[in-house]
A protein has these predicted regions:
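Short amphipathic alpha-helices in soluble, non-transmembrane regions
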Residues: 114-124
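Secondary-structure transition/turn motif
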Residues: 72-73, 104-109, 152-156
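Short amphipathic alpha-helix segments
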Residues: 74-88
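Generic alpha-helical secondary structure
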Residues: 74-77, 112-116
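Histidine-centered divalent-metal-coordination microenvironment in nucleic-acid enzymes
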Residues: 66-69, 81, 90-113, 135-139
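Structural alpha-beta junctions
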Residues: 85-91, 122-125
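DNA replication initiation on ssDNA origins
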Residues: 1-67, 75-78, 125, 131-156
Length: 156
């Protein structure tokens, strides 16, 4: 999938235009851009600065109705996927391009940080991903450390 199409999917289809989110470009050497909102760069994507940013951004903010399970072990994926299917939740599993996997779970409403934390703990995943101030590697973009694409491996 094209990165811009995916960003549009997050904003329009999943977020229903109610949830703007931050994007950033980072490199391993510590080079980073300012956090910029989706609406700021994607509405005027023909502007050369915005076009460059969209083409190069590789991190995004976790959405208020999204829970991200950050896992290192591949063998943990299938039991979690089974449970998410039983709960009839919308989810996508990505190989992060770094060491592990991200399971993105999209809920029907916004969650508090505490609710996200409880769900993350239930699956014994990285609790740092409960914060609204946490950036994650952007789907279909090169990871800032490895330069490998964060790619979809499973979803419903």
């Amino acid at each position: 999938m094209d990165k811009k199409c995916f960003l549009d999917y997050l904003f329009y289809s999943l977020g229903k235009q109610n949830h703007d989110f931050y994007l950033q470009y980072s490199q391993e050497e510590g080079v980073k851009t300012k956090w910029r909102k989706y609406s700021e760069v994607c509405v005027d994507c023909e502007n050369p600065k915005n076009k460059w940013f969209i083409e190069n951004c590789n991190q995004r903010q976790i959405l208020p109705f999204e829970v991200v399970l950050d896992l290192e072990e591949k063998e943990r994926i299938n039991p979690i996927v089974k449970e998410l299917k039983e709960r009839e939740l919308i989810f996508y599993v990505y190989l992060t391009g770094s060491r592990g996997y991200h399971i993105h779970i999209f809920m029907k409403r916004e969650l508090t940080e505490r609710e996200k934390l409880n769900m993350i703990k239930q699956f014994n995943a990285d609790t740092q991903k409960a914060s609204g101030k946490c950036l994650i590697s952007l789907e279909y973009a090169p990871h800032w450390k490895s330069n490998k694409i964060k790619d979809l491996v499973n979803g419903n």
